[in-house]
């Protein structure tokens, strides 16, 4: 695992939330922000280094404005010459290192891996065709910029998640409040 770079995707506009999601307190642990949580789980998963995709927090700014997570992924690949990255969204507070380890274990055959039925997290194995695809798609407005199309194009492997209920995104104040009022869950380190 020590060869994998962890990346927190935190470059979005948070329009539906109305506030920067990265700065929100974790709904089940107010001692840390959502950004702190995402960085912590990448570290606890064994990533060699953790970086932030986004213009704040000394992060890597998107080279393509308003293009979603694919712009963040491309910008990180362009800035850091490595072959393996583990991308997590900043707004997934129930995600834990054990789930990320499922992706790492499945990717040991050298392929990119994601959980079926959800766009992120993603264990991405990088080669020239991955970078070329992202550059082409982001450069033209008429291209399909969905992550699932990207995964299909690079032959990424979808795997089942052992705990899909932990793959919840917080996108609105209502999502955030709903998670806060649920019976507290015991989060794994």
Question: What function would you assign to each model-found segment?
Answer:
Residues 54, 112-129:
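Short beta-strand-to-loop element that shapes/binds the nucleotide-sugar donor at the catalytic cleft/hinge
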Residues 143-189:
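Conserved alpha/beta core of the MobA/IspD/sugar-nucleotide pyrophosphorylase nucleotidyltransferase superfamily
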Residues 121-154:
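Short, glycine-/small-residue-rich phosphate/pyrophosphate-handling segment
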């Amino acid at each position: 695992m020590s060869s994998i770079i962890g990346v927190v995707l935190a470059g979005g506009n948070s329009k539906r939330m109305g506030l920067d999601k990265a700065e929100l307190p974790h709904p089940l642990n107010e001692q840390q922000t959502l950004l702190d949580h995402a960085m912590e789980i990448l570290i606890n998963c064994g990533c060699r280094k953790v970086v932030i995709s986004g213009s704040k927090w000394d992060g890597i700014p998107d080279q393509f404005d308003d293009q979603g997570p694919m712009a963040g992924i491309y910008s990180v690949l362009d800035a850091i010459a490595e072959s393996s990255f583990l991308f997590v969204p900043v707004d997934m507070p129930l995600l834990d290192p054990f789930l990320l380890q499922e992706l790492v274990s499945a990717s040991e055959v050298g392929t990119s891996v994601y959980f079926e039925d959800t766009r992120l997290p993603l264990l991405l194995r990088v080669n020239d065709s991955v970078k070329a695809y992202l550059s082409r798609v982001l450069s033209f407005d008429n291209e399909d910029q969905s992550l699932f199309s990207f995964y299909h194009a690079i032959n990424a492997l979808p795997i089942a998640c052992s705990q899909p209920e932990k793959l919840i995104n917080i996108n609105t104040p209502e999502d955030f409040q709903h998670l806060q009022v649920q019976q507290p869950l015991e989060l794994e380190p």
